Structure formats: structure tokens, C-alpha cells
């Protein structure tokens, strides 16, 4: 029986099992997802599969480099306690090294990269999930080839924020590091104003206009004056998310853009990972959690 590739993908997302295991499970279950999950559990993947419905919103972010490439990645766990575990930290480092030795360009490709242990990253994650007792997942990564310009990485001490920057020309390592640290601290969404999409601008202007409705002094101003004030507020808001328009945390007497211009370099790539961003955490009342375990 032919197996639908979409079903394989769906089963992998549910169980974190390997691609070929999912294919075999679907073949043995007549393409029935529920029966395929049972098949996987019956064939030794039950422990990992049972944990995949949990939310893994903790973990660490890491940026690492070798002579040719740089990788930035986020690996998630369910609790901060596990994220500080030496076995977990070693696993993340092993995954980073494997990715640096690969040409993977997508999460799907990355999961199939082999680590030094001989297992694929996907298999290593399944094994760690079963051993540690929490869902462990590679959420995302990006692999960047080094160029003739400068590149820099920054890993914050809490292991929750990492940045990767690439410049078009050579930049002093200390200066580059300071910019990378600024990106970690100030969390710009875009390199410059030109990168900000219209959807973001329109959404921000809508919020500004709604807020202005409750300001009697603003509403009393002539329409043209009010319009200019609102535009000014929007420009200020956009500057907050545009790296080059932010005041440099190292010296707030000038903007990041002015600093880079004085060094005759341009930033061509900016990546910032923060653990758990965009993941909705499930908050459980401790008493309820204990009661649930006693049932």
C-alpha cells in the first residue's frame, strides 16, 4: 500500500519517530494515524511517543563555529532543570558539531544528520527523550557559511539567548562582539527600517490610533497636526525594532547604524534566538498537578 507523505510528516510530528519507522507503521496500519501510533508504541518507541504531546518550552540556545561555518540552534526541554543537566548540554553540543559538519538547509535535513555516536540527530533526540524522561526537541537551526567579511557569535550567560551576525567587511572582533551583545539585549526584529513589512507598520499604526482616541488633548488638535503626531509615534515605534536605528547600548550617544558606518561596514545578516519565543507554555497549578498524579 502506498503511504501518503503528508501522513508520514504528521505521524513524525506527533511521535518524533524516524521517517522510515513512520512509513512502516503506516503501511502496517493501512494509513490510519491512531493505529500507527499504537504500532510504534508496540515496537519500542512508546516511551518517546507518549511524551510528544507535552510542551517543550525550556532549553538552551547556542551559537557555535568552526573555520568554515557557523550554526545557531535552539534545543528544547520541558523544564529548566533538565536544560541545566550536563547530559542535556552535551547533547546540544553534539548536535551543534554534527550540524557544523553538514550542509543541512532545513529542519528535516538536519534531523537526518549523523552525530559522532553514529545516530542521527533525530534518533539522538528520541533516545534522550526516553532516557531523561522529558520531551527533547531540536526546534530550529540555521547554518551559515563564513565569507571574506566578519562574522561573530554571542551566547548569553543564561544560555537562553544567542546571536549570529555577518558583516560585509572586516570589523574589529571587540566591536563585532559588542554589536552581537547589543542584539541579544535589545532584541531588534529587523536590521533596518526597509525590512519592516507593511503588515507590521499597519498593525502598529492601528494600535497608536486606538490609543489616541482616549487622549482628549490629542483629539482636540487639528487633523493635520494629529496626523503628524501619530506618524511621529509610529516612527519612534519602528525605530525600537530596527537595529540600525536603536541607540547603541555600549554608548547611547549614537545609534548602531552610525557606529557601523564609522567602521565602514554593513550588517548583512542578523539572527537572534531566544529559548521558547513564540511557544505557548502550559501553566499548571502545583496542587492541581499533584492531584492529577494521584488519580
UniProtKB/Swiss-Prot annotation:
Localization of this protein:
Cytoplasm
Instruction: Name one cellular component (GO) term.
Output: cytoplasm
Work out whether the entry's keyword set contains Cytoplasm: yes
Keyword list (alphabetical) reads:
Cytoplasm, Elongation factor, Protein biosynthesis
Report if keyword Secreted is assigned: no
Predominantly, its location class is cytoplasm
Region (Involved in Mg(2+) ion dislocation from EF-Tu): which ranges? 79-82
Q: Which SUPFAM superfamilies match?
A: Elongation factor Ts (EF-Ts), dimerisation domain, UBA-like
Top-rank taxon of the source lineage equals Bacteria
State the Pfam families in the record. EF_TS
Q: Which GO terms describe its molecular function?
A: translation elongation factor activity
- Signal sequence region: none
- Into which family does the record put it? Belongs to the EF-Ts family.
Q: What does this protein do?
A: Associates with the EF-Tu.GDP complex and induces the exchange of GDP to GTP. It remains bound to the aminoacyl-tRNA.EF-Tu.GTP complex up to the GTP hydrolysis stage on the ribosome.
HAMAP family reported in the protein's UniProt record: EF_Ts
Supply the name of the protein. Answer: Elongation factor Ts
The source organism is Mycoplasma capricolum subsp. capricolum (strain California kid / ATCC 27343 / NCTC 10154)
Q: Which gene encodes it?
A: tsf
